UniProtKB/Swiss-Prot annotation:
Full protein name: Large ribosomal subunit protein eL21
Family per similarity comment: Belongs to the eukaryotic ribosomal protein eL21 family.
Keywords (A to Z) from UniProt: Ribonucleoprotein, Ribosomal protein
GO CC, one annotated term: ribonucleoprotein complex
GO molecular function, one term: structural constituent of ribosome
BP GO annotations: translation
InterPro entries reported for this sequence: Ribosomal_eL21 (IPR001147), Ribosomal_eL21_arc (IPR022856), Ribosomal_eL21_sf (IPR036948), Translation_prot_SH3-like_sf (IPR008991)
Cited SUPFAM superfamilies: Translation proteins SH3-like domain
Gene name per UniProt: rpl21e
Residues forming coiled coils: none
Positions of region (Disordered): 1-23
């Protein structure tokens, strides 16, 4: 019997799948979204774009934009008492009011 894969996308079948209507590449507007420091954003992974994709454990988490790193944004949030920072491309982020 073979060993189970332990890659960065393992165990993410439900998170990474899209519905039939949403399949394919995202629109250009979605790729070029802009955020300001202090904006609230949620991580919504778009599996069609592997660049700047955060780990699937962070799917659905909401945090505050604290800065930029290249063309990606740094999103900070707390898990328990631990402050976490995730670097994600704007395609994988959605503004929250």
């Amino acid at each position: 019997m073979t060993k189970m894969s332990k890659g960065p996308r393992s165990g993410s079948r439900r998170v990474m799948t899209k519905s039939v209507k949403n399949k394919g590449m995202p629109k250009v507007n979605e790729m070029m979204k802009t955020f300001e420091v202090g904006d609230r954003a949620a991580i919504v992974i778009n599996s069609a774009v592997p660049d700047g994709m955060p780990h699937h454990d962070f799917q659905g988490i909401t945090g505050v934009i604290t800065g930029m790193q290249g063309s990606c944004y740094i999103l900070s949030f707390k898990v328990g008492n631990v402050e976490k920072k995730v670097i994600a491309a704007p395609v994988h982020l959605r503004k929250v009011q």
